[in-house]
Amino acid sequence: RSAETFPLMIETSYLLQSRFIALEPDVLREGSLYAYLESRYNMEITDAGEVLSPMLANTKERLLLQIPAHIPCMLCERFCHEREQLIVIHRTVVRGDKFKFKAAYYVDEKTE
């Protein structure tokens, strides 16, 4: 993904092959991976977890992100499950000099 004239992040998704047979990669150029999987394969993510870790990019990642070796990055790994079955691993390398993470947390009020 890019913003203006520079790349921001590298996104890679690993899908459970037996769950997503005959995947059509060209369709992904036009929209969201998750929207495509939901409509084409009736995917329903029931839970997901995410891990954020600081990192330095490897040679290939530095070339794609157009950054020197000393620029820190953030590795975001998301693990998506469908009824306790791991179906998607999403790996994102985000350049640390042009991107901020923002999180918001909400309390779910339980009704009695």
Where in this protein do the model-derived segments appear?
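C-terminal all-alpha effector/ligand-binding and dimerization domain
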Residues: 1-112
